[in-house]
């Protein structure tokens, strides 16, 4: 079928022979002139500081595994590339595969031992879970729900920048959902905390996996109600109202932050609405 993804997440068993493998460490992937996927049996014969191996899915019908390495060792003719590089450039199906593999690799690294009794954890075949054989504790891959919101005021949008951003880039507001609150409550609270304004008329737009390292971004538009911008100390370097015809440098095209902005621009101008990547 036209447009069908070449990547499908899954759990091919590590007991079977063959397939492709990704080498991962600290949100970086090993690559050579042929790419990121290596013949599995060949790469496993190299002297690698292996922590864990997990099946992660299928690429063009072939099983794919991830090797989580203890450190990013150097191998002749190969180099390590950061995950963010693949978000910004190149094949989106490939980025989805790498994002999933990175999250599984990090989960495997962080859950080698039981947090309750210290026993070495064991991966299970029937589902994606690490289980302690001593006390029975289960650990599933971590997923952190986060709201991300574009605050609007007619032909103006409220954008902010964190000290961690690329210089000059402004984006939407975002924050993690706390225990006991709904995503909608999180939107109102985070906007108030980060920039000191009140919002209403929330509209859910869509969601996007964000593997940096394990967020699920839940995107909203919200209308400004009241208040003056007061940036949160240590979190927000600057925040401003920007006219739609005079926007600052914006986030990457593939991000949900950029989609929220582009969607609002399209709606105000009557243009065709963009499709959220992923």
UniProtKB/Swiss-Prot annotation:
Residues that hold substrate according to the record: 84, 127, 140, 208-215, 257
Amino-acid positions noted as binding Zn(2+) in the UniProt annotation, renumbered to this chain: 114, 117, 132, 135
E.C. number(s) listed in UniProt: 3.6.1.-, 3.6.1.22
UniProt-listed InterPro entries: NAD-cap_RNA_hydrolase_NudC, NADH_PPase-like_N, NudC-like_C, NUDIX_hydrolase-like_dom_sf, NUDIX_hydrolase_CS, NUDIX_hydrolase_dom, RNA_Hydrolase_NudC, Znr_NADH_PPase
Record domain Nudix hydrolase: where: 141-265
Residues that coordinate or bind a divalent metal cation 1: 174, 194, 235
Stored PROSITE patterns: NUDIX, NUDIX_BOX
Positions of short motif Nudix box: 175-196
Binding of a divalent metal cation 2, residues: 190
Record's keyword terms, sorted: Hydrolase, Magnesium, Manganese, Metal-binding, NAD, Zinc
Cofactor note: Divalent metal cations. Mg(2+) or Mn(2+).
Reactions catalysed: a 5'-end NAD(+)-phospho-ribonucleoside in mRNA + H2O = a 5'-end phospho-adenosine-phospho-ribonucleoside in mRNA + beta-nicotinamide D-ribonucleotide + 2 H(+); NAD(+) + H2O = beta-nicotinamide D-ribonucleotide + AMP + 2 H(+); NADH + H2O = reduced beta-nicotinamide D-ribonucleotide + AMP + 2 H(+)
Example GO BP: NADP catabolic process
GO cellular component, one term: cytosol
Binding site for a divalent metal cation 3: 190, 194, 235
SUPFAM superfamilies: Nudix
Required cofactor(s): Mg(2+); Mn(2+); Zn(2+)
The keyword Metal-binding is annotated on this UniProt entry: yes
GO MF term set: magnesium ion binding; manganese ion binding; NAD+ diphosphatase activity; NADH pyrophosphatase activity; RNA NAD-cap (NMN-forming) hydrolase activity; zinc ion binding
Subunit structure and binding partners: Homodimer.
Similarity field: Belongs to the Nudix hydrolase family. NudC subfamily.
HAMAP family to which the protein is assigned, alphabetical: Nudix_NudC
Protein function: mRNA decapping enzyme that specifically removes the nicotinamide adenine dinucleotide (NAD) cap from a subset of mRNAs by hydrolyzing the diphosphate linkage to produce nicotinamide mononucleotide (NMN) and 5' monophosphate mRNA. The NAD-cap is present at the 5'-end of some mRNAs and stabilizes RNA against 5'-processing. Has preference for mRNAs with a 5'-end purine. Catalyzes the hydrolysis of a broad range of dinucleotide pyrophosphates.
Protein name, per record: NAD-capped RNA hydrolase NudC
Protein's organism: Pseudomonas aeruginosa (strain UCBPP-PA14)
């Amino acid at each position: 079928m036209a447009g069908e993804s070449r990547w499908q997440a899954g759990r091919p068993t590590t007991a079977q022979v063959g397939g492709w493998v990704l080498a991962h460490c600290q949100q970086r992937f090993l690559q050579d002139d042929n790419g990121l996927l290596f013949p599995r049996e060949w790469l496993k014969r190299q002297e690698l500081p292996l922590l864990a191996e997990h099946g992660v899915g299928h690429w063009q019908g072939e099983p794919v595994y991830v090797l989580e390495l203890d450190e990013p060792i150097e191998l002749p003719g190969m180099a390590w590339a950061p995950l963010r590089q693949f978000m910004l450039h190149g094949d989106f199906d490939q980025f989805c595969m790498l994002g999933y593999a990175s999250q599984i690799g990090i989960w495997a690294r962080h859950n080698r031992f039981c947090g309750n009794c210290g026993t070495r954890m064991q991966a299970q075949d029937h589902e994606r879970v690490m289980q302690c054989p001593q006390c029975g504790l289960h650990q599933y891959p971590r997923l952190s729900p986060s709201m991300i919101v574009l605050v609007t005021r007619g032909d103006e949008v409220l954008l902010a920048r964190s000290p961690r951003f690329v210089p000059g880039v402004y984006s939407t507001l975002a924050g993690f959902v706390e225990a006991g609150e709904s995503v909608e409550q999180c939107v109102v609270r985070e906007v108030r905390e980060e920039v000191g304004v009140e919002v209403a008329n929330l509209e859910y737009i869509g969601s996007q996996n964000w593997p940096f390292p394990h967020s699920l971004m839940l995107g909203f538009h919200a209308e400004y109600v009241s208040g003056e911008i007061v940036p949160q100390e240590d979190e927000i370097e600057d925040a401003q109202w920007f006219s739609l015809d005079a926007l600052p440098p914006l986030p990457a095209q593939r991000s949900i932050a950029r989609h929220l902005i582009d969607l609002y621009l399209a709606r105000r101008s009557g243009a065709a609405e963009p499709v959220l990547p992923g």
